[in-house]
């Protein structure tokens, strides 16, 4: 039994008392539901710390075992290498993306948690990209629901991201530099333009606020565009992607992939995407060879000019 498992068993009711609950003051009357919720929050926070400690110990043990067996300890780049790669590039890939998080009051608590998790995945995708871009999280309301959810992620302040509190993308960038990506737009984004910042709406709404991002963008006088999904693939479902899928797609295209390949590698399999079949026919070399052979046979069956002249001459002599 490791130290963490022992610690998990040693969690006492005193550790989960209201005195250890965040946001509570002794002597303040609380309802039964509030007390129950606070106890659950305290228990979750305490157990999460212990689980993380156990996970770290397991990773250390795996590294030790790998070293003893002479196996490679790490399969991917180290944190130091990733940081060095990002700083060396400095956003030279030309990709600049702003995640619009000014939807704090429109999402339920569970959707806010999902939104922040997507931001974490976006940050990870950008760090691991061969050409990391400039990433901006805009419109965060200080001490709002999204801000509080960010605080639950240890080390979030150290992410290599530009945070903007109480400031939206229109307060930071020139309007002419912004392109808001929405599936309702009439314009198609066929090429990433240098000097542009592409805005992705950080809204997890399950289609409750359909068209809201597009409406806000047009009201602000911003250029909008949609991803060229229908131009490159056929899908069984609507061409609506999550925030981090849109960012991942942009990252791959910025790194040099073509749209079709990037789309097929990014979107979930449940959407049943298949590359669009074009009308342009590929040359069939087998048919070409067969046609050439038939042409040669036809030419050989034709009487040559010399043969025709000889036959005419023989008829003249007979007469």
From Swiss-Prot:
Keywords: Chromosome, Coiled coil, Methyltransferase, Nucleus, S-adenosyl-L-methionine, Transferase
Highest classification ranks of the organism: Eukaryota, Metazoa, Ecdysozoa, Arthropoda, Hexapoda
Catalyzed chemical reaction(s): guanosine(9) in tRNA + S-adenosyl-L-methionine = N(1)-methylguanosine(9) in tRNA + S-adenosyl-L-homocysteine + H(+)
Effects seen without this gene: RNAi-mediated knockdown is viable and adult brains show reduced levels of m1G9 tRNA modification and enrichment of m6A modification on mRNA transcripts, in particular those encoding Hsp70 chaperone proteins.
Pfam families named among the record's database cross-references: tRNA_m1G_MT
Residue window of motif Nuclear localization signal: 35-42
Entry-linked InterPro entries: MT_TRM10-typ, MT_TRM10-typ_sf, TRM10/TRM10A, tRNA_m1G_MeTrfase_euk, tRNA_MeTrfase_TRMD/TRM10
Enzyme Commission number, as recorded: 2.1.1.221
Effect of residue 201 to R: Abrogates methyltransferase activity but does not affect the protein's influence on Hsp70 chaperone protein expression levels or on organismal stress resilience
Similarity field: Belongs to the class IV-like SAM-binding methyltransferase superfamily. TRM10 family.
Database matches in PANTHER family: TRNA (GUANINE-9-) METHYLTRANSFERASE, TRNA METHYLTRANSFERASE 10 HOMOLOG A
Broad class of enzyme this protein falls into: transferase
Protein name per Swiss-Prot or TrEMBL: tRNA (guanine(9)-N(1))-methyltransferase Trmt10A
Biased composition (Polar residues): 17-33
Function: S-adenosyl-L-methionine-dependent guanine N(1)-methyltransferase that catalyzes the formation of N(1)-methylguanine at position 9 (m1G9) in tRNAs. Modulates Mettl3-mediated N6-methyladenosine (m6A) methylation of mRNA 5'-UTRs and 3'-UTRs independent of its methyltransferase activity; influences mRNA stability and protein levels, in particular of Hsp70 chaperone proteins and other stress response proteins. Also regulates stability of transcripts encoding proteins involved in signaling processes and proteins involved in neurogenesis and axon guidance pathways.
Keyword Methyltransferase attached: yes
